[in-house]
Amino acid sequence: MNQTIDTNKQRNWAATYDVIVIGFGAAGATAARFAADNGAKVLLTDAAPEGHEGGNTRYAGQVVLTGYDFDKMKHYFKQLFGPIKIDEKMLDTYVHGLTTIPDYFKRYLEIKSPVSYNKVHRDPDFEAFANGLSPEYPEFEGSETVDLTTVHDGYFDASLWKTLRGQVTKRENQIDVWLASPAKHLIQNPETGVVEGVQIQRHDQLVDIKANNGVVMALGGFENNNDDIQNFIGVPKLKVIGTLYNKGDGLKMAQEVGAKLWHMKSFEGFGFNTGFTFENTAEARGKFILSPWPDLSNGSIFVAADDGSRYVREDENGRHGHAFEHGSWKNPTVYSHPHLIFDREQYRQIKSRGKLPYDDFFKITVKANTIEELARKIKANPKTLVQTVERFNVFSENGEDLTLNRSGDTMRAFGDGPYYATPLATAMLNTQGGAKRNEQAQVLDAFDQPIPHLYSAGEFGGINANQYNGGGNLAECLIFGKIAGENAATVKHDIEVTPESTSTTVDLGGNDLSSDQALSNYSVGKDQYLGVSDAGIGGRVIVRVTYRDDQLKNVEVLEESESEDVGQKAMTELPKEMVTQNTYDVDAVSGASSSSRALKSAVRNAIQKATQPAKNSAD
C-alpha cells in the first residue's frame, strides 16, 4: 500500500500535531516530554492497550548504564563493539550521555538522590546480580568507570518506567496519549521526501494524522515476529521475556520510506545458565528466572540440543545471553527444542528444595525409564543422547569436561532411571535492529542521508551491537529520546504548517491517560470503600473493599493492568487470602512482588477510609 502523498490531491488529515511519537516506552516517553518542553503539541501513540504500554521498559531491571570518565568509557565501548564498526560521532554522543546520567536523573526526572548501583547493594538477593552487570566485562580496560544508576535502591519494580510515565501524564495539556492505536504507515511526500504524518489505526479506523515538525520512531524491536527473527537473526525461534507488543512494525514503516537498517542480527537475552527460560506452551511470555538456581548446573544434569548432544557449558553465567566463544562473548547457537536432561538422583535433589523459582517445573517435565525412551519422547536421537550421557559420565568420573570445559566438581555421573527432560527455550530480552540513526537521532536513508522530519530512539535501531553491558539500552532511550524529541520539535519551514485541527467526521477520542477519570467511574454501597494505588507495574490498581465490624468481608479488584502471568495470579489469589486472614498484609505471590505490593497498598488505602469514615471519599 503506497502511503506517499499525491501532490495533485489534498490529503484529508483527521488531526494535526507538531510532533508524533510512535511507541510509549522509555524512548517514546522521553521524546514526547522533551518535545512538549520545547513548545510542541505532541501525539504519543502505542499499539499496546492501557496497562501494557511501556514496551520492554516495564519488564527491565530499571538500571541505567553510567560512566564517570568519558575517555575510559569510550575505550570500554570500543572493546564491546570489537570488530563491529560504529560511527564515531554516534559513539561520542552516546558515551557523553552516559557520563551525565546522574545529573539527568536530577534535572529531568526529579530524582533528588539517584542511587549508584555500585555503592548500594542492600538486598542480598541482588548483590551477585549487581556485581555481574557493573561492569559486565570487568576484564576490559576502562571498566572501572562503569556504574549503573537507579531511581531508588530497587530493581525489576518498574520504578524508572513509572517515573518516565509520570513525566508524560503531568504534561497532559501538551501530550495526547493514544493506546491500542498502532501506527501502520509513515506518510511521506514523494517529491520532497519529507515525512509529513502517520497513518494510525484508531478505534477500528485508519486515520491520517499530520506532524508539522517531526515524527519519532520509538516503537521497539521485533521480538514477537518470528518471521523477522528467522530472517534477520537466523534462528528458529526465541522465547520473549519482555513485552508482547514489539512486533517489528517499525521495520515495515522504515523500509517503506527508504530507511537503512542496521544491527539486525544483534539481540540480548537473560536467564539461568547462559540465558535460558522454560518452554511452556501455556505461557506467551517466558518466565524471567533471576534467582540463582544451582541445581540446574550442578549434579547429574546437562543441557541437550535437538539431537541430544551437549552444546553449552551449563555452569557458565551468561552475559545477557552471551557465552564465551574463542575469545569473545557470542549468542550461543539457538535450537528448536533443547532440554535439561537429568536422572533420578537429580530429580530428588531438585524436589527437596520445596518451592522452586519456576512453579511449573515438574508439570512440564517428561519422564522415561530409559535414556532411549526419553530421547524418543523429546524427539532427540536415541543413539546420540545415550552417547552424550556416557561421555558425561566419563567426564564426571575423571573430573574433567573435555567437551565444554564445565567444572568437574559440578558434574555427577548419571545413575539408574527413571530419567527426566525439561523443555527449555533461549530467552529473548530485546532485539537491537532497526532504522539506522545519526548523532542527531535522524533516521538515515540507504545512502546515509537524513530522511526529512524522521527521528528515532531506543531499541528500534539501537546503537548497541556485538557485546552488551546491562543498562545500555535504557540509557540509550534516555539519551537519544531527549535528542529526538528536541529536534523533532524544532519548527520546520519546508512544509505548509497546518493549525491543530480535528476532522468533524472522525471520532478520535481523547487522551487515553487523562487523570479526570480515576475513581469517579466506580460506585460504592453500604460498608464499601474504594482504594487506589499507583505502585503496580501496569500503573493504577483500584479495589472496592467491604469492611464491617473490623472485618474484611470482601476485596474486589476493579481496575488493574498487571502482566498476564504472575501479575494476574496476584490479583486473583491475594484478595481471597486477605479476606481469610482479615488483613491486607499477606505474603506476596512469588515472582509478582510489585503487583502484590500494589494490591496490598490499594486495599490498605480502602481500609484506612473505612476506619476513618470522616475522611472517606472517592478521590
Predicted regions span which residues?
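A glycine-rich dinucleotide-binding beta-alpha-beta segment and adjacent secondary-structure elements
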Residues: 185-187, 194, 384-464, 530, ...
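Active-site- and interface-proximal helix/loop "cap" or "latch" segments in soluble metabolic
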Residues: 521-618
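Conserved redox-cofactor binding core of oxidoreductases
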Residues: 96-206, 226-227, 274, 396-416
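Extreme N-terminal leader/targeting segments of oxidoreductases
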Residues: 1-19, 37, 66, 462-464, ...
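Glycine-rich FAD pyrophosphate-binding loop
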Residues: 37-57
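N-terminal Rossmann-like FAD-binding beta1-loop-alpha1 element of flavoenzymes
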Residues: 19-44
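Glycine-rich loop(s) and the adjacent beta-strand/alpha-helix scaffold that form part
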Residues: 202-205, 210-278, 474, 480-483, ...
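An anion/pyrophosphate-binding glycine-rich loop and adjacent beta-alpha core
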Residues: 251-253, 260-380
